[in-house]
Swiss-Prot record:
This is Uncharacterized protein y4eI. It is found in: Membrane. The chain crosses the membrane at residues 33-57. The lineage of its organism: Bacteria, Pseudomonadati, Pseudomonadota, Alphaproteobacteria, Hyphomicrobiales. GO terms for cellular component: membrane.
Length: 103
């Protein structure tokens, strides 16, 4: 059975239900802020190093595609990509015309 990402509304409820496990994020707003910091930060991190504490899950959850934990991981990965796309620098129109490197 193919794994599917947890819908964001369900992820919000799932995070709130895990407060006793002390995840870094207990709401979507906290999750978005944390993921934005990961995306914008000066160093790259392994997903295991930041998703596990973010969701208060064990690394083994990455190996089981038919669990709520994996569905939450999948949702966080998609959210990471969405936030990355928003924060990614875009070339300016003048750099496209001149061929200048915008980075």
């Amino acid at each position: 059975m193919a794994a599917a990402a947890m819908p964001l509304e369900e992820l919000e409820r799932w995070l709130q239900a895990r407060v006793d496990r002390q995840p870094i994020a207990t709401s979507l707003a906290m999750l978005d802020g944390y993921v934005a910091a990961i995306v914008a930060g000066p160093v790259s991190m392994s997903p295991l190093d930041w998703i596990c504490p973010l969701l208060a899950i064990d690394a083994d959850a990455f190996n089981h595609g038919d669990t709520p934990e994996f569905a939450a991981i999948f949702a966080v990965a998609l959210r990471h990509n969405d936030i990355s796309n928003v924060l990614r620098p875009r070339p300016t129109s003048s750099s496209r015309c001149t061929g200048a490197n915008p980075w």
